[in-house]
Structures are given as structure tokens and as C-alpha cells.
Regions:
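Flexible, solvent-exposed loop/hinge segments and secondary-structure transition points
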Residues: 1-112
Length: 112
């Protein structure tokens, strides 16, 4: 019985280049258990804040097929919205794109 998936995913869209993460996804293929950073080389004090637990924990327990980055404070009530890091929207999008890639793989690559 499958209880979930751990998928390594990357996005080349980071301000400093490649962002690589590991994403835990429940067996339903839509609920994110959490993420962990494998590699990230973003601007100190801005994009590197993606590694702060307070930012990336917003993925924990979120359910959706594709997440979207919004300005900080705009997405708290919508399950598919991720609040951007202030001053680091590009990094926020890169991490979110990697999570979306992992979700896509679970739902389209594994289930075929």
C-alpha cells in the first residue's frame, strides 16, 4: 500500500540559478506533507530566506494540483496560494515551480 511519495524536483528559475528540493506528497497525490532543500544559491538575506521554516512550512498540509505565488499576505485563505518572500518573488516562484513539478510527476508520471 502506497502511503505517500518523496520526489526530488528542481527549478532553474531561481535568481541564483537552480533550486533543488525534496517534496513529501501524500498518497492522494495532492497534499504536500512538506519540503526540504537539497541545494539553493540565492541572494543572502533575500532569496536565501526560502530556507526559513516560517516561509516554507506554508506548503505543509496544502492540497492542490498547482500552487501559485502571491504577494505576502494575499494568499492566506486560499489553499493553492503561496505567499512570496518579501523582496524575493523570483525565488518564491522557483521553489513553488519545483513543488508543482513534483505534484505533476506524481499525478502524471507515476500513475500512468
Amino acid at each position: 500500500q502506497v502511503v505517500g511519495h518523496i520526489i526530488n524536483a528542481s527549478s532553474k528559475d531561481g535568481y541564483g540559478g537552480l533550486v533543488s528540493i525534496s517534496v513529501g506528497i501524500q498518497a492522494d497525490g495532492q497534499t504536500v506533507n512538506g519540503i526540504a532543500f537539497l541545494s539553493i544559491s540565492e541572494s543572502a538575506g533575500l532569496g536565501m530566506n526560502a530556507r526559513d521554516t516560517d516561509w516554507y512550512k506554508q506548503f505543509n498540509g496544502k492540497k492542490g494540483e498547482k500552487f501559485e505565488v502571491t504577494k505576502a499576505g494575499d494568499g492566506e485563505l486560499d489553499n493553492e496560494k503561496i505567499n512570496a518572500i518579501s523582496g524575493a518573488t523570483i525565488t518564491s516562484r522557483a521553489v513553488t515551480n519545483a513543488v508543482n513539478a513534483a505534484l505533476y510527476f506524481v499525478n502524471n508520471g507515476l500513475k500512468q
